Amino acid sequence: MSVSNVFFVGLMGAGKTTVGRAVARRLDLPFFDSDHEIEARCGVRVPVIFEHEGEMGFRDRETQMIDELTARHGVVVATGGGAVLRPENRAFLRERGTVIYLRANPHDLYLRTRHDKNRPLLQTENPRARLEELHAIRDPLYREVAHFVIETGKPTVAQLVNMVLMQLEVAGIVVPPAASSPTSQVSRQS
């Protein structure tokens, strides 16, 4: 089966890695998480990179990794939440594959990430307010780059995976194994 690339974007805690890994498994494709790949290359966790190189240093590494990963063929990639901040990353993603925006509201994201110390942008006095700020800034960028938007609020991971596969099948991008899924929380982006 010929499959193009599938890229997941969204804020931290939206489920990009979990859903992306499951979609890759169902499509029998290799899966990559851009943050994990950066960590493997550097030999340290993302918070350490932020501490030593600052956010801009990390973003430089991220752009290089996004370029490398999106240049491959037949892969599923979960991007870091801030990958869409740079125009070149948005171009790599939009032009080299199908982009799925896993959208979650800031409250749900806060509940999912509040105990995670590996999220440097949330190590603030008010992480909930920070998530609301990040959502306000990034949501338009995610929508700009996305081919599909999937709301992650209520569905289970299995339902989200089926929703992604259904959208890819309807768009003629893949012919996945039989999967029935709800469609009420999916919207097509032009």
Curated annotation (Swiss-Prot):
Transmembrane segments: none annotated. Mg(2+) binds at T17. CDD domains: SK. The lineage of its organism: Bacteria, Pseudomonadati, Pseudomonadota, Betaproteobacteria, Burkholderiales. One of its GO terms (biological process) is chorismate biosynthetic process. It is found in: Cytoplasm. One of its GO terms (cellular component) is cytosol. Substrate binds at D35, R59, G81, R138. Binds 1 Mg(2+) ion per subunit. It comes from the Bacteria. It catalyses: shikimate + ATP = 3-phosphoshikimate + ADP + H(+). Keywords: Amino-acid biosynthesis, Aromatic amino acid biosynthesis, ATP-binding, Cytoplasm, Kinase, Magnesium, Metal-binding, Nucleotide-binding, Transferase. Catalyzes the specific phosphorylation of the 3-hydroxyl group of shikimic acid using ATP as a cosubstrate. It is an enzyme of class 2 (transferase). Its cofactor is Mg(2+). HAMAP family: Shikimate_kinase. InterPro entries: P-loop_NTPase (IPR027417), Shikimate/glucono_kinase (IPR031322), Shikimate_kinase/TSH1 (IPR000623), Shikimate_kinase_CS (IPR023000). ATP binds at G13, A14, G15, K16, T17, T18, R119. Pathway: Metabolic intermediate biosynthesis; chorismate biosynthesis; chorismate from D-erythrose 4-phosphate and phosphoenolpyruvate: step 5/7. This is Shikimate kinase. Its main location: cytoplasm. Pfam families: SKI. Belongs to the shikimate kinase family. Its EC number is 2.7.1.71.
